[in-house]
Each structure stands twice: as structure tokens, then as C-alpha cells.
């Protein structure tokens, strides 16, 4: 089953009752259209459910692939799409042999990460982040934006409130009304930030440092340097300006660990913001004590699609249909990405200011980067 989904409001891909998940929604609707029994709708293992890539809470997919056992009829896809909510679409269902496993047959995966341009603004002089890299940082016009914001905060908040907001010992929740008001004001100010070509180039240079085989133990949880399972191979990274105000990062890798991409993007953002040399990234592949890297928001991450080159070669040799979307389906997927996924990412930023919260989090970073 080839499918795409907007992950906003879902607790990830994998079936995990009582939480709302993509697999849970698919199972329910498969039963509703008569493709599986009621008993099997409550137990994914009975249907041999396996995804080519698992996506976490809030993460989207332009294309993912599920291997599963169902009763397939001519109208199954049409009935499923009629029953499913608009944020989940089935692109097609293709018969495969009984031994096919979507996860093990997948050679590699393409991911995208969308970030607003303002996330690359330099740190304010008063921030902990600026103090940590003060010797490397040269003024690039960002401080003018922060000076404007400072004047706005003095007119909006009392001295006591500003102290509470700036005190790193007070870990105010993002849901705190004071923080929400502060970040809402910050969002309006940062929207006027103009990204320079040199800042975008610096971010891309940092992202290119990931290409190759490296030990990504600092980019996930529960891994130590030297653990073979922390070795990952990144095939390609492409950075471009996707739409006005947004940057698209495309990453092609064999496989990824929990939070790996979000931390890869976060570290490259920090390097570009603070004007650190791109090869600072290499320090995080090295042996030694674990280094802290914040996680960029899940809302910007989407699975572009799994790749089945090896398996498709076998299918071609047997004169079978390959596992890949045709041109018409690809057009539908691209429209879905724009209308459902990109719209949801932009809407969440407008409503919840997730990337503004992340800018504030980075500004308060006390951990040395060098």
C-alpha cells in the first residue's frame, strides 16, 4: 500500500492504542471497507503490517509504503479514500509475493525538512548563545531586529515579567500565557528578517558535512560512541529556498535513528546562526562525552519517500511491475504535499509559533558548541 499523510494531530505512524495514529486509522477503515476482519483490525501483526519508514508524532509523509495482508478488490482504493480523512490518502495498492517486507526491502529513504528563513537569524548580544560563541560572531544586521524586538518587549511586559522570561533557571512551559505572549510578539518581529545569500550558503555548507558514513551517536538517544548501530550513511543533501520565507532541506540516507534528522538540522542551524565553521559538525561524530544537540520541531519533518532500487531490479528482471508511483500519482502526491502538508506546517507556525519557540530555546543554550 502506497500512502501519504499529514501527521499533525497524530501520535506517529505506528499503531499505539489508545493514541490516534496513522496505522490505527488505516486499520479501522480497512475493516469498514471489508478488506480485513474485525478481529484483525485490532491486531496489526495478524495482517503482517510493516512500514518502510516509521514516522514519529507530528511527522508527515508524502509517500510511505505498508506491506500487509488484505482482501483486495477492484474498488478497495476508492472505498478507502472515501472513508479516510482528507489528511490521509492511499495512492495505490499493489500485490507482492508473500515474503515481501516493506522495511527490509527498502534500500534508502528521502526526507525533507522545512524551516522558516528567520530561524537563521544571528543570536542577540544579550543571549547565552551569543556569549558562548562571542569570539566567532561578527555582526550581520541581526542585532537591529533584536533591538526592535527589545523595544517592543519593554512596551508590552513589566520588568518582573521580563526577568522571569530571561531567567534560564525558571523553565517556563511553552504553554505558559506569558511565554505565549512573548513568542507571539517575537513571531511578528522575526517575520521581517531578510535572509542573506551568505547565511543560506553557510547553512548549506554545514548540512553538507553530514554526507558520508559517520557515527551519529550524539544525534539520537541511548547510543554511545563506538556503538556500530549508531553508524549511518548519508547519500545526499540538497538545500533550496522552497517558497517565500521557507527553506527546504532534502536528505537521502540508508536509514535514520530516532530524532536524528531533527538534530542534524538543529546543529546546522546553530552553526549558521553563530557563524561557526561548517566543519564544527564533525566534532559531534568524534569519541568522547556525549554532546548536547537540541531537537528541531517535528512539525517541519516529512518523509518524501522510500527507495526500493534493489527490489525493483529483481522485479524488472522478472518482468513484474516495479514498486514506485507513476507520473499521474506523483503529481497527486506533489499536490497533496503543497495543499495538506506544507499548509499544515505554515498554519502551525502561525497559530503555535513552534519555530519561534525553537529560536528562543536556542538563544538560551548554555552548552558550549565549540
From Swiss-Prot:
Matching InterPro entries: PsdUridine_synth_cat_dom_sf (IPR020103), PsdUridine_synth_TruA (IPR001406), PsdUridine_synth_TruA_a/b_dom (IPR020097), PsdUridine_synth_TruA_C (IPR020095), PUS1/PUS2-like (IPR041708), TruA/RsuA/RluB/E/F_N (IPR020094)
Record lineage: Eukaryota, Fungi, Dikarya, Ascomycota, Saccharomycotina
Pfam families referenced in this protein's UniProt entry, alphabetically: PseudoU_synth_1 (PF01416)
Keywords annotated in UniProt: Isomerase, Mitochondrion, tRNA processing
Family stated for the protein in its record: Belongs to the tRNA pseudouridine synthase TruA family.
Record field: catalytic activity: uridine(27/28) in mitochondrial tRNA = pseudouridine(27/28) in mitochondrial tRNA
Cellular component, GO, one term: nucleus
Protein name (database record): tRNA pseudouridine(27/28) synthase
Superkingdom per UniProt: Eukaryota
Residues forming the catalytic site: 56
Organism the protein comes from: Saccharomyces cerevisiae (strain ATCC 204508 / S288c)
Job of this protein: Mitochondrial-specific pseudouridine synthase catalyzing the formation of pseudouridine at positions 27 and 28 in the anticodon stem and loop of mitochondrial transfer RNAs.
Subcellular location: Mitochondrion
Molecular-function annotations in GO: mitochondrial tRNA pseudouridine(27/28) synthase activity; pseudouridine synthase activity; RNA binding
Enzyme Commission number(s): 5.4.99.44
Amino acids binding substrate: 111
Group of enzyme by EC: isomerase
Biological-process GO terms, alphabetical: mRNA pseudouridine synthesis; tRNA pseudouridine synthesis
